[in-house]
Design a protein with these regions (language model features):
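Extended, compositionally biased accessory segments flanking or bridging domains
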Residues: 1-137
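Extended, non-transmembrane interaction/recognition domains
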Residues: 133-148
Length: 148
């Protein structure tokens, strides 16, 4: 079983940007856990989707029914209404600060040793703080980074 912190980091590492809304499926099967931990928050739904059309795809507008937890669109192939679960077009925003705070607590960085300037390179490098080196009075900086 993978740690939720590691699963979230892997999901972040596969995203092109962290400052844009993201489809729920990009977070994998753990996305509900990420919502509960407030690492991601709902940010609405897509208004258009790509659907099969002959040997290609076509963009169509969707009608969202939040109360019924579904969306629908008119199929360009046969004109019938297609109904799908709303989760398929749910968008989320990333709350990177919440995840970084939880990660700092997990690895045991004391509150007074947490960084006041966390973001070093936007969307790529963060300074969590200073971690005590075991058995000494020395501290080492702790950074987390993701690929370009």
């Amino acid at each position: 079983m993978t740690s939720p912190h590691l699963s979230f980091f892997c999901a972040l590492d596969n995203l092109p940007r962290l400052d844009a809304s993201v489809l729920a499926d990009r977070f994998g099967r753990d996305h509900q856990q990420f919502v509960q931990r407030r690492w991601i928050v709902p940010a609405g739904h897509l208004t258009h989707v790509m659907v099969p059309f002959l040997d290609s795809e076509q963009e169509v507008e969707v009608d969202v029914d939040v109360d019924a937890n579904r969306y629908s669109y008119c199929s360009p192939l046969n004109g019938r209404t297609v109904v799908q679960p709303l989760a398929g077009i749910a968008l989320y925003s990333i709350v990177i600060g919440s995840w970084l705070a939880d990660l700092s607590a997990l690895i045991g960085i004391e509150d007074r040793r947490r960084s006041s300037n966390i973001c070093r390179i936007p969307n790529h490098l963060w300074h969590l703080g200073e971690q005590r080196i075991a058995g000494t009075h020395n501290f080492a900086p702790v950074f987390i980074a993701r690929a370009w």
